[in-house]
Amino acid sequence: MLHIVCRALFLVTSLNFTLIKPALDISIEHSTDVMDQVTFGYSTKNIPIPSEKDFTIELIKSVEKFVKNLKWRAFHYLNPVNNRQRKETYGFNTTSPPPKVDELNELKDMLYDLVVSIKFKKHSNEFQSKLKEDIRNIARESKMYIAADKTNNFYKVPKEMHEELLKKQIQKDYKKTDESKVKDITKKDKDIASKLEIDDRVYTTAKRQSFITLKDHKPNFQNTQPCRLLNPTKSEIGKVSKKILEKIVATVREKTKFNQWKNSSSVIDWFKNLDDKKKLKFIQFDICEFYASISEKLLLETLEFAEAFIDISDEEKDIILQAKRNLLFDKNIPWVKKGSSDFDVAMGSFDSAETCDLVGLYLLSKLQHLKVNLGLYRDDGLGVCALTPRQVDLIKKEICKIFEKHNLRITIDVNHKIVDFLDVTFNLESGVFKPYMKPNDNPLYINKNSNHPPSITKNLPAAINKRLSSISADEGVFKNAIPPYQEALKNSGYETNLKFEANNTTKRKNRSRNITWFNPPYSANVSTSIGAKFLNIIDRCFPPSHVLNKIINRNTVKVSYRCMPNFSQVLSKHNAKISKQMEAPEAPPGCNCLGGPTVCPLDGQCKMDKLVYQATVKRTDTQETETYTGLTGGTFKTRYNKHMSDFRTPSGEHATTLSKHVWQLKREKVPYEVSWKKLTRGSTFNPTNKTCQLCLKEKYLIMFSPEGATLNTRNELYNTCRHRLRELLSKVKT
């Protein structure tokens, strides 16, 4: 029986594309252009049908990753080491090429055949046709699509206006720095990784373009255009810091018993356990720009506080602080936080949530003397007390003083019986809690006809039903709250009727297994049942008598479909393309051949880099040809010179299958000539998404244009990307 598990997140939303001019003209001092509000009637998490080529390249990536993981598992199984101490790697995987395992050769051949035999079919419906048309319209648009901060809106913004808004937001809190600062931080990252013996696993911090979202929920938005600046550049050392902070936070939370909530459910449990609710009043506060406001001094005070509950070494403190040395990039130019320190708790960094939680526990410790039942979820605080309004006002002032002492600004409301906290409304008078929805923020869900794995769209209504039931006090509250959610489901193509379910907290115990996952992409236009064929291959290659059957069978190897790029990624690529148009155009690659372009092996483009090329070897006596497909991350001229050296030097005979063929012709004294041409270009290894488009494109051409790769071998599908090595901290020169 086919066992396919689909593990994918479904942040939700639905579909109609309408352009709405804002009620007021939006202008900016330097421009007469206006923002056009774009309300997508569908979720940007919806997935369009990909091209056959895009799908196949993703499938190649999945097969390559699966075989690599399986090689390592098989190698350790076949070569056991007694009493081997497991090294702490902080979640970083090895970057070493997997060892050769002959027992997997049949599997590799059959997976190769599976990829090249994939069949496609026509798949279309009204929703996908609409999505396809919208993507075409976006491709023709000259403006950028900027998301709203807390609503589902988007705004079409002229690129000049976007640049001005981004620049203004950056200059408010950051100042320019130079590459020496980047090198200094990278050197320190390498020192830490080397001490932990993981510098051969950790990549240098990738420079990622900062961006903004628009706070269209703020008053007078049309005239002020308030923005939120987001910095996606993340220090890889933050992953180590995250592990350390998780341990510290868990210990401090357990020993102090402070009300630090992890989610809405824990807040609801706290609310349910309140006695004499009618006598109580709420105290609610929000820490303004909490992440950005955490200073180095405050974090050091927090760590000193935590040391009363858990030992924290100087090395661990050093790692935590180093992870906060964050830079922001705009067009590859580095910016650093204003002031004398480069300390910055960037929202979205690997350890920012844990840092926020630890500082939150420290702040809660400073509020304990108030004798108020207070709790905190990240930057949102909530408490209750039975004091008089006058006494509560005094407590309010004291809370403000405490936060101000730590250079934190808060907004605070007191003496209320009803509050909206996270996604729940709490009522002390009635003792009831119910779902809360922000004003003008209608729910949107992924459409039933989105190109998601079927298990996701099938289980979506049940997941929404479970969530709404868990934040509803009873069936009556649930029924009153569901109309907008029911309508959103209907608009997204679902016929399911939401029905209240009593909260069942019993968790099913699952036996833990060491699973090796195969994660092929899913697309509705693929007629081949990839999951079923894959599992049949596992059965055929590893029968009960096989030496690896114990670790490679249907219980230990499973399939989990993953998603193709969604509509949000289409918008991001469009914005990147428009932004790049503002930069100076890239100069032609040119040629540096002594005889000029007329003798250039690549028609005057030999200085071009990051390309896949084809070499054609022709016997001049019989006109028979053989072809070879290769790639280079550097310039073609450098790679060409290496090929020429291999053709001349006996030691280079086995460097490539191309040089091996040329040497065979030379031994047989066969006259030949070699010609070269460019096939395609692609970006080299990206540490952010762990993908090398250049290598994937080469593998695709070898597999699906075999006439241009007669000298290449099938094993090249499983070659490890060499470009990733240059991105490792171990390769940084200090």
Regions found by a protein language model. Give the residues of each.
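Non-catalytic, polymerase-adjacent accessory regions of viral genome-replication enzymes
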Residues: 1-216, 502, 506-534
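Conserved polymerase palm-domain catalytic core
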Residues: 28, 32, 274-398, 402, ...
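Conserved pre-motif C helix in the palm subdomain of viral-like polymerases
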Residues: 207-256, 288-293, 338-368
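GIY-YIG nuclease signature motif recognition
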Residues: 213, 244, 286, 348, ...
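A short acidic-Thr-Gly-centered motif at the start of a beta-strand
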Residues: 218-220, 263-282, 366, 613-622
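Polymerase palm active-site segment centered on the conserved acidic dipeptide of motif C
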Residues: 314, 375-376, 383-462, 478-479, ...
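Conserved short loop/helix modules at catalytic or binding sites
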Residues: 421, 634-686
